[in-house]
């Protein structure tokens, strides 16, 4: 299977906080090294999983700089830098590029529900403002509107640095159409861990993963198995970790993931409002899966 420039196993990295709610630089560097040691190809700070809606612009730049410093020469860094104001999104993209990001992940404008022409002009403005590659992030469940396949293809054909799309629509018909019609340069990345196998089986280029925060080597192995057309291995990994993939969304992302990472001793379990800790019932379900997979000891969930 062909490997495009932005392909493979990418992690949507969490942002660790201290108890005073400031960014925990030591823990962030630890997380980046955990990813590098386990073969992650692309590290994505300041996305949805990184709690970007509750980070200030200054904090986003701080996080991106730390990640770029720690990952330099070892993994690509595609920084989350999107918002629903085109002017602001351009400012964020420029700041991310200046901070050292090798690519930009830009979420579709949310809440204001632009037309398809509005989506096009939004991304055109961003792409023309920076020189690094752009990953379009289509996530209708969060934004309230869907970027059509025609629009994504138009953007990729017209703009030299639009090189990938993170497809988190969950719509396999739409993803299939995109894979069948895309220009050669465009990488199509699954935005949902449970869909890594089917999307890559259809010709997709990898995953921007939530679960890679917890099990980076597992996600990497699944992606590599699909690149190698080793469906037997891929199915085994997919089936073994499918429950974890889905339990990561038992409550708002990234709460289950940060809960897990705290149990693993990698971060403190701290969120910024309006995100709150898991309910007792959700903890019990997630704990059982974490113990079964050997990610934590049973004593750690007592």
From Swiss-Prot:
Localization (cell): Cytoplasm
Binding site for pyruvate: 49, 208
E.C. numbers: 4.3.3.7
Sorted UniProt keywords: Amino-acid biosynthesis, Cytoplasm, Diaminopimelate biosynthesis, Lyase, Lysine biosynthesis, Schiff base
Family assignment from sequence similarity: Belongs to the DapA family.
UniProt cross-references to NCBIfam families, sorted A to Z: dapA
Protein's UniProt name: 4-hydroxy-tetrahydrodipicolinate synthase
Naturally occurring in which organism (per UniProt): Chloroherpeton thalassium (strain ATCC 35110 / GB-78)
Origin organism lineage: Bacteria, Pseudomonadati, Chlorobiota, Chlorobiia, Chlorobiales
């Amino acid at each position: 299977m062909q490997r495009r420039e932005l392909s493979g196993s990418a992690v949507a990295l969490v942002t660790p906080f201290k108890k005073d709610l400031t960014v925990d630089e030591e823990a962030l560097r630890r997380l980046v090294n955990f990813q590098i040691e386990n073969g992650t190809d692309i590290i994505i700070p300041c996305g949805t999983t990184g709690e970007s809606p509750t980070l200030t612009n200054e904090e986003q730049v701080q996080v991106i700089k730390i990640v770029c410093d720690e990952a330099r020469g070892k993994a690509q860094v595609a920084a989350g830098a999107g918002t629903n104001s085109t002017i602001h999104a351009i400012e964020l993209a420029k700041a991310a590029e200046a901070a050292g990001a090798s690519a930009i992940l830009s979420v579709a404008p949310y809440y204001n529900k632009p037309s398809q022409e509005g989506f096009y002009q939004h991304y055109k403005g961003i792409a023309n403002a920076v020189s690094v590659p752009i990953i379009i992030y289509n996530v209708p469940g969060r934004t309230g509107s869907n970027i059509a396949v025609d629009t994504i293809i138009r953007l990729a054909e017209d703009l030299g640095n639009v090189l990938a799309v993170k497809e988190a629509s969950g719509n396999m018909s739409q993803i299939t159409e995109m894979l069948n019609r895309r220009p050669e340069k465009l990488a199509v990345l699954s935005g949902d861990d449970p869909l890594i196998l089917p999307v890559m089986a259809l010709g997709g280029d990898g995953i921007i993963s939530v679960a890679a925060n917890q099990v980076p080597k597992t996600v990497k192995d699944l992606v590599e198995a699909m690149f190698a057309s080793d469906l037997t291995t891929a199915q085994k990994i997919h089936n073994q970790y499918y429950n974890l993939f889905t339990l990561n969304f038992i409550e708002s992302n990234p709460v289950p993931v940060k809960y897990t990472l705290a149990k693993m001793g990698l971060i403190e379990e701290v969120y910024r409002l309006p995100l709150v800790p898991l309910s007792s019932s959700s903890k019990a379900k997630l704990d059982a899966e974490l113990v079964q997979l050997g990610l934590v000891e049973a004593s750690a969930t007592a």
